[in-house]
UniProtKB/Swiss-Prot annotation:
One of its GO terms (cellular component) is plasma membrane. This is Cytochrome c-type biogenesis protein CcmE. One of its GO terms (biological process) is cytochrome complex assembly. It is found in: Cell inner membrane. InterPro entries: CcmE (IPR004329), CcmE-like_sf (IPR036127), NA-bd_OB-fold (IPR012340). Belongs to the CcmE/CycJ family. Heme chaperone required for the biogenesis of c-type cytochromes. Transiently binds heme delivered by CcmC and transfers the heme to apo-cytochromes in a process facilitated by CcmF and CcmH.
Length: 147
């Protein structure tokens, strides 16, 4: 009787371990496309990512760089005060998108141009990663809501 209880306990523990490993693997597999790493323009220029890598870029929209193309295609540049990366985006831009304002874009860096699939724009640091906000404030370039 004791051996039967011990064997049953071992089976339950083994089954629970297998279920835990399997669920962890499934969660990791499901999240692989949802994880986007953030980079500043200076980092992108120093070490260009592979064209297949999807990541986020953040900084300020460079003054005088917005060029509207045919249809919904927009070209502009993003800067962190040290580096400047050209960006193309096809779609409708957020209402708060304008020159000298913060933005974060999701996309890929292909042939020296960041091709954005999504653009977020905000007048304060809500969508801006802390590293970029600090870098821009250090250089006196950032114009946030704190005055």
């Amino acid at each position: 009787m004791k051996n039967l209880k011990k064997q049953r306990r071992i089976q339950v523990i083994a089954l629970a371990t297998v279920a835990l490993v399997l669920s962890t693997a499934l969660i990791g597999y499901a999240m692989r496309d949802g994880i986007n790493f953030f980079r500043a323009p200076t980092q992108i220029l120093a070490e260009p990512p592979a064209p297949t890598e999807v990541f986020r870029i953040g900084g300020l929209v460079e003054e005088g760089s917005i060029v509207r193309g045919q249809g919904e295609t927009i070209r502009f540049s993003v800067t962190d005060g040290n580096g400047v990366v050209p960006v193309t985006y096809t779609g409708v831009l957020p209402d708060l998108f304008e020159e000298n304002q913060g933005m974060v874009g999701t996309g890929s860096y292909i042939n020296g141009v960041f091709e954005a699939s999504e653009i977020l724009a905000k007048h304060d640091e809500t969508y801006m990663p802390a590293e970029v906000v600090d870098m821009l404030k250090e250089q006196g370039v950032y114009k946030g809501t704190e005055g």
